[in-house]
Swiss-Prot record:
This is DNA polymerase IV. One of its GO terms (biological process) is SOS response. It catalyses: DNA(n) + a 2'-deoxyribonucleoside 5'-triphosphate = DNA(n+1) + diphosphate. Its EC number is 2.7.7.7. Keywords: Cytoplasm, DNA damage, DNA repair, DNA replication, DNA-binding, DNA-directed DNA polymerase, Magnesium, Metal-binding, Mutator protein, Nucleotidyltransferase, Transferase. Mg(2+) binds at D8, D103. The lineage of its organism: Bacteria, Pseudomonadati, Pseudomonadota, Gammaproteobacteria, Enterobacterales. It is an enzyme of class 2 (transferase). The keyword Calcium does not apply. It comes from the Bacteria.
């Protein structure tokens, strides 16, 4: 029996904004395009959701529901950065990772030896690690198949998890509304209800032939899901493109010696993480990131063939001297970009 975890970050874009600017934490905020440009909401925090603001809602409607809504344009580099860090955390537990978007993924931990092989404990530890390292919360679902893991991750949001053991699947399905199954939209749900089908238990009693005539291929999928059948594998994560490590300080730093000391502490962790995916430590580029007390950030990198601490320190010093402008620094990060597989093959052939 497989052990599948679905991890879903809680209002991810908004959560990153609130983490980086605590003044936003207790007020309604949303990420989206402006009303003038007929934008839509990407996500909203929980204070905004209390007013009915939702993802994919037109910005104009959101502002009518919540006139004091703080609308943010979004910082997708920051979201991508956090997403990459989260996926790196996943990789500590399994190589079988299927990202669905920046803020959610499936993990197959069937063969994982972590936490004595307990998927429940692995999910809990992953969520704790995400919060410890990124100050972001995640929800998780654990089940023997993918669609149930995804449904389960929504059961105890935010910052919770829900487990459906193999023994619990039949009872869980009996009362599960069909609208909860991924892929069943409002139109399909209405058609099913017109047939007297509201739950998976109802579909279990329905003849498959009827479902096939009414819904075609989707009818079979619906019938299988209602039986708890989902044979889809977790598709492994695409080849990793970068590895990074960073630290947000409790208090801003103002002296180069403090920054250098942080790099000295970060470097061994970067080396450890890189060695897990590239034991030879060969890379395409390496660089540093500084985030300042006004939440602006700068990244500087250049081509370098192998992870090198002295070069990272020199790059950081140059960045510190040229771009800080007297500002305090709240975050220091180190990262490397991995060689493209085709480029790596060419280098090997060249040798």
């Amino acid at each position: 029996m497989r052990k599948i975890i679905h991890v879903d970050m809680d209002c991810f874009f908004a959560a990153v904004e609130m983490r980086d600017n605590p003044a936003l934490r207790d007020i309604p905020i949303a990420i989206g395009g402006s009303r003038e440009r007929r934008g839509v909401i990407s996500t909203a925090n929980y204070p905004a959701r209390k007013f009915g603001v939702r993802s994919a809602m037109p910005t104009g409607m959101a502002l009518k529901l919540c006139p004091h809504l703080t609308l943010l344009p979004g910082r997708f580099d920051a979201y991508k950065e956090a997403s990459n860090h989260i996926r790196e955390i996943f990789s500590r537990y399994t190589s079988r990772i299927e990202p669905l978007s920046l803020d959610e993924a499936y993990l197959d931990v069937t063969d994982s030896v972590h936490c004595h092989g307990s998927a429940t404990l692995i999910a809990q530890e992953i969520r704790q690690t995400i919060f410890s390292e990124l100050q972001l919360t995640a929800s998780a679902g654990v089940a023997p198949v993918k669609f149930l893991a995804k449904i389960a991750s929504d059961m105890n949001k935010p910052n919770g998890q829900f487990v459906i053991t193999p023994a619990e699947v039949p009872a869980f399905l009996q009362t599960l509304p069909l609208a909860k199954i991924p892929g069943v939209g409002k139109v399909s749900a209405a058609k099913l209800e017109a047939m007297g089908l509201r739950t998976c238990g109802d579909v279990q009693k329905c003849d498959l032939v009827i479902l096939l005539k009414r819904f075609g291929k989707f009818g079979r999928i619906l019938w299988e899901r209602s039986q708890g059948i989902d044979e889809r594998d977790v598709n492994s994560e695409r080849l990793r493109k970068s590895v990074g490590v960073e630290r947000t300080m409790a208090e801003d730093i103002h002296h180069w010696s403090e920054c250098e000391a942080i790099i000295e502490r970060l470097y061994p962790e970067l080396e450890r993480r890189l060695a897990k995916v590239k034991p030879d430590l060969l890379i395409a580029r390496q660089g540093v990131k500084l985030k300042f007390d006004d939440f602006q950030q700068t990244t500087q990198e250049h081509v370098w063939p192998r992870l090198n601490k002295a070069d990272l320190i020199a790059t950081a010093r140059k960045t510190w001297d040229e771009r800080r402008g007297g500002r305090g620094v709240r975050l220091v990060g180190l990262h490397v970009t991995l060689l493209d597989p085709q480029m790596e093959r060419q280098l090997v052939l060249g040798l």
